[in-house]
Amino acid sequence: MPAAATLSPRMRAALAVASTILLIKASELLTLSSIPAAAGLGLLLAGCVLQWASLDGAVSSLVLASVVAIGGPLAELPFIELGCWHYLAPTYFPLQPWTGDALGLSPLTGPCYFAVTTDAIALGRWLASGVEPPDGYS
């Protein structure tokens, strides 16, 4: 059971948003720091797991956030190819055998997707907590 289980869905959503903001800011600071990418990735992943464990704790949420953490950054590759944006210090090149160093990602992007997914789940639960089911449904 998560540490915040006794809190209302609204408070859990607020804590999820606040912790996501902190994790994304930490990602920025780690990107600009001299800390090795692997260490920064470990720190962010630990923060994400702490966020999930303390605010949610559901295995289904962990699976969903993990899938999004992997698939989200990969879904950015077409936009990087089109020149919509690029990363300042890409060190992860998932398509390197075919594209060389043209399509690079920051390894810190995945944990940000994880945190935002945990955030979205908490917001969804809060919004759903005030919704009454239609007649005939329970």
Regions found by a protein language model. Give the residues of each.
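Aromatic-rich, lipid-facing transmembrane alpha helices and their immediate juxtamembrane interface loops
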Residues: 1-138
